[in-house]
Amino acid sequence: PMQDVGVNNPSTTVLIPCRNEKGNIENAVKRLPNFCDDLEIIYVEGNSQDGTLDEIHRVIKAYPDKDIKVLVQDGKGKGDAVRKGFDNARGDILMILDADLTVPPEDLPKFYRAIVTGKGEYINGTRLVYPMDDQAMRFLNFWANRTFSVLFSWLLNQRFTDTLCGTKVLTKKNYEKIVSNRSYFGDFDPFGDFDLIFGATKLNLKVVEVPIRYAAREYGETQISRFRHGWLLLKMVLFAYKKLKIV
């Protein structure tokens, strides 16, 4: 069990980075199970154009019994949102839930159990195990993700089947260690996920993957520009290769 937290039912912060996700804000709260006694929800809002911020304020008022906070991004991108949210989180355990809800909030208790029972210290969701909604991960996306997972598994000497799944879970203590090591990899991480993966493997944390059902988004448009992100990912691979394999 969790020696570095030292409690059986540790508090948790669920971080929800969101930009133009007005239609998903309330569902995230409604569908999130109460899997621990002390659950904090932090929305980090990315200067949306569709009234997402107003909707978050409405939801905070509508659910007074839940501990929901909102922060507005100064910078841009998911990486910036994750850093801002986690820096302000009070939970012993930190989780990321993407606001598009393609990873069902109902699956988060599995991540909680995996970290609390000591199965792993860095829990990564994987969307490649369960069958997916037809629309959820298009063919090109699926193969790109497969390819990058193989590359990153080789680079990091850890098996990752899905490096791009948005749901990651780790303890606040380990997150703080990753932050103090961050200069090693620099701030080049437009996705906000890879500095956590790099940092976790550099600290030799025990990485465990939790399979999740991956659903098509119900509201809004995907904010992934495939080719731009593919190019950025390729740069990340080369960058990591220089850092990790050329010693």
Language model features with spans:
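Hydrophobic helical membrane-anchoring modules
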Residues: P1-S11, N27, N34, N181-V247
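Short beta-strand/loop segment that forms part of the nucleotide-sugar
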Residues: D38-S48, L71-V72
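A conserved hydrophobic helix/loop-capping motif in glycosyltransferases and polysaccharide synthases
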Residues: T12-E21, A28, F35, V44
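Donor nucleotide-sugar binding loop of glycosyltransferases
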Residues: E21-N24, S48, K78, P104
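Short aromatic/hydrophobic "clamp" motif used to bind/position activated sugar donors
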Residues: L94
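A conserved acidic beta->alpha catalytic loop
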Residues: E45-D54, L101
